């Protein structure tokens, strides 16, 4: 018993260490967890013999349900709503198109029989939420055209459709699926998944608002809700993953008590589940078997990455007239990961196939995470898809947008009293704090002994004001014929109830004073008090 505990602790600590190292090296952490599992596995150095697919499927299903739930819980619906139609098309029809194209390729190019070809396509049909979320967050990829929200919503919602196709094909391969049975299976998967997801979410939110739950037990309650939302529809033949994702979105975007305390809890729980899942899948693999399936797996991976996925994306996004650069990034960001391997374990458990579907899928996932995951930030920059004005963290509902803090940027001119002064000697405005200093290309955290120099850009923090009644803003454009053109603000007629607070001049924002000269084309932002 103690040996197992020591081994478990060693694995967990190794995962934490690898997560830190991989982020510095730019390698996806999930890949490191898989490699660690292979290191401990039957063909690895530690040589822990593990080939219990049934046990692995159960553990991985539990891990995946929490990953799916938190994927929904972390989705900021306000940010994601404009992309919802695109995301739903990609997560439903996109999965079917991708799976169908891969199935055709496997049959005609690799000579695999029809049902098994489409089973492989179904298993790898969905993109991986854990991988996509991890890269978007860790690399802070602020993508243009709301692409981060699109990828987040698509990758979080397409696993249920891949799961549904996998279940249908496994039933067909067993000979237990007639035409009527398949129609009912599709109906049950979608209907029960949606209805139970919506119903459980509605009841849970009502209970959390009305019942006072003791501190700490709210996390227990939400954990139970997540498990319940998966188990109930699954027992009745519905899609548990779809139900879980719906409940996650509903709870994550609802106004419930202690929501901020739930975020770190589920962050930790989901992180642990990802470690467990990818480590277990690495442990279950036999690296010595990989060379036997390397060529067909590589062929499928290349076709999936450069043909099937792009064709599905370009076809489905064509009616929306999306930018080519956005389509290319969405195509490239179709990473395969945990869900694909979990479904491959399920397929291995339920078929007597001559093909090693598990290791074929395993190779495809390694290829996807290593190549696509590593190059996604690079391609985003090359395709000019990085939006410097946005923060990708806003697409997640745990982004702390409610923190009442605003930032003020200020460049130190030569004649300013702060120039050549120590921070400790500078008199800041009341209730403000100097939090950052940029000097050329260097960013510094200022201390009391830090010397402020000319052209230093300072960032000050201040409390956001509460709602102030009776204040309204208006805009006024200065034209060439305007009587204000060419005048300084001090020369304008003074109005007690109005103040020019901002001037927008082309791409420049100016905080005015009495000596500011107004020019044609200036947009004045004026504050009026009732």
Enumerate the language-model features and the residues they cover.
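Transmembrane helical cores of multi-pass secondary ion antiporters/exchangers
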Residues: 1-389, 402
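Cytosolic regulatory regions of ion transport systems
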Residues: 311, 318-329, 339-530
């Amino acid at each position: 018993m103690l040996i197992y505990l020591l081994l478990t602790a060693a694995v967990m600590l190794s995962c934490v260490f690898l997560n830190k190292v991989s982020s510095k090296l730019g390698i996806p952490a999930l890949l490191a967890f898989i490699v660690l599992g292979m290191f401990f596995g039957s063909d690895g150095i530690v040589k822990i013999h593990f080939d219990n697919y049934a046990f692995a499927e159960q553990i991985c299903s539990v891990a995946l349900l929490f990953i799916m739930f938190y994927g929904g819980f972390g989705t900021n619906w306000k940010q994601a709503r404009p992309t919802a139609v695109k995301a739903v098309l990609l997560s439903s029809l996109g999965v079917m198109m991708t799976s169908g194209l891969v199935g055709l390729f496997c049959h005609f190019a690799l000579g695999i029989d029809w049902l098994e070809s489409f089973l492989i396509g179904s298993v790898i049909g969905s993109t991986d939420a854990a991988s996509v979320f991890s890269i978007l967050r860790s690399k802070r990829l602020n993508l243009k055209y709301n692409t981060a929200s699109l990828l987040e919503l698509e990758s979080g919602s397409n696993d249920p459709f891949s799961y549904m196709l996998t279940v249908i094909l496994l039933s067909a391969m067993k000979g237990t699926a007639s035409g009527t049975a398949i129609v009912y299976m599709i109906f049950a998967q979608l209907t029960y998944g949606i209805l139970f997801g919506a119903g459980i979410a509605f009841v849970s939110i009502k209970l959390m608002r009305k019942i006072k739950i003791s501190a700490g037990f709210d996390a227990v309650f939400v954990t139970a809700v997540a498990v319940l939302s998966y188990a109930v529809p699954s027992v009745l033949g519905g899609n548990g993953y779809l139900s879980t994702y719906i409940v996650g979105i509903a709870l994550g975007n609802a106004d419930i008590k202690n929501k901020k305390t739930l975020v770190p809890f589920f962050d930790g729980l989901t992180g642990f589940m990802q470690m467990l899942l990818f480590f277990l899948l690495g442990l279950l693999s036999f690296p010595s078997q990989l060379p036997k399936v390397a060529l067909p797996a590589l062929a499928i991976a290349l076709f999936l990455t450069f043909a099937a996925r792009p064709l599905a994306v370009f076809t489905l996004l064509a009616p929306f007239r999306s930018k080519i650069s956005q389509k290319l990034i969405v195509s490239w960001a179709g990473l395969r990961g945990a869900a694909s391997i979990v479904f491959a374990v399920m397929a291995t458990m339920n078929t007597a196939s001559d093909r090693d579907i598990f290791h074929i899928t395993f190779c495809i996932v390694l290829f996807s995470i290593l190549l696509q995951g590593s190059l996604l930030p690079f391609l985003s920059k090359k395709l000019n898809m990085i939006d410097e004005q946005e923060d990708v963290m806003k697409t997640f509902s745990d982004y702390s947008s409610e923190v009442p803090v605003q930032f003020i940027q200020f460049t130190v001119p030569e004649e300013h009293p702060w120039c050549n002064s120590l921070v400790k000697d500078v008199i800041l405005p009341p209730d403000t704090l100097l939090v950052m200093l940029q000097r050329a290309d260097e960013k510094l955290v200022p201390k009391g002994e830090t010397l402020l120099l000319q052209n230093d850009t300072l960032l000050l923090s201040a409390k956001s004001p509460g709602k102030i009644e009776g204040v309204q803003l208006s805009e006024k454009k200065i034209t060439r014929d305007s009587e204000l053109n060419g005048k300084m603000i001090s020369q304008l007629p003074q109005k007690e109830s109005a103040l020019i607070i901002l001037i927008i001049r082309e791409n420049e924002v100016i905080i005015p004073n009495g000596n500011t000269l107004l020019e044609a084309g200036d947009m004045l932002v004026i504050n009026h008090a009732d």
